[in-house]
A protein has these predicted regions:
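Accessory, usually C-terminal, subdomains that scaffold auxiliary metal cofactors
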Residues: 127-132, 136-193
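Short acidic, hydrophobic short linear motifs in intrinsically disordered regions
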Residues: 21-22, 99-124
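Eukaryotic partner-binding/assembly regions in large regulatory complexes
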Residues: 1-72
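Short, positively charged loop/turn segments that connect secondary-structure elements
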Residues: 33-36, 113-133
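A short secondary-structure junction motif
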Residues: 91, 115-119, 144
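Positively charged, polyanion-binding regions of nucleic-acid-associated proteins
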Residues: 71-101
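Leucine-rich, amphipathic alpha-helical/linker segments
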Residues: 2-16, 77-78, 82, 172-193
Length: 193
């Protein structure tokens, strides 16, 4: 949904965002989503993602390359959805630092079940919903290039200057979440000074 989020971004950034978004839900000028109910749900998710980061982030986002925008949207997802952040830290980074360097549906699903054991809200989800969340997360990893079709992990590929942006906004953890090696992170930090 990166294209849809980018399409409504000017509405979200506007001083009159609420009225413009309500109009979009009704008139479907930008999203081209068939049903009003689905548009309403999509707009609610876009608002959640928009609010997960400072407004200045979005101004910079509009000037990024398409590749950098894809990675930026991954960052936003990790900020907006705690469960995705937990999957990244507790499954993906751990697997990246292990011998196997691969992640399967079952690896993430096991983490989902551990989260559900401690979180009544997640525990209340149906098994189908839990599986859908895991599947969506894995799809995101594939779209940003962290996971390939054979479930092997790969670091995010971006120029150092694009990664340095996350340092300037006080989010250095994202470099590790992007599976960069410590020496790469140090090089980016040094170049950002």
């Amino acid at each position: 949904m990166i294209n849809e989020m980018t399409a409504v971004l000017p509405l979200l950034m506007s001083d009159d965002a609420d009225a413009l978004l309500k109009d979009e839900i009704i008139n479907n000028r930008l999203l081209k989503i068939n049903t009003e109910t689905t548009r309403k749900r999509a707009i609610a998710e876009f608002q959640r993602r928009y609010k997960a980061v400072p407004p200045a982030f979005w101004k910079h986002y509009l000037d990024m390359s398409l590749q950098a925008q894809n990675i930026a949207m991954f960052f936003v997802v990790l900020k907006a959805y705690r469960i995705c952040f937990d999957f990244q830290v507790n499954v993906v980074i751990k697997k990246w630092n292990s011998v196997s360097q691969s992640v399967t549906f079952n690896d993430v699903y096991m983490q989902m079940m551990e989260i559900a054991a401690d979180d009544p809200f997640v525990d209340s989800w149906s098994d189908a919903t839990k599986r859908k969340v895991v599947g969506s997360y894995l799809t995101i990893l594939r779209k940003v290039g962290i996971l390939n079709d054979s479930d092997a992990l790969h670091p995010v590929s971006l120029p150092d200057a694009d990664f340095a942006f996350y340092l300037t906004i006080g989010e250095p953890w994202f470099l590790e979440a992007s599976l960069l090696q410590p020496y790469e992170i140090e090089r980016i930090k040094d170049s950002a000074l």
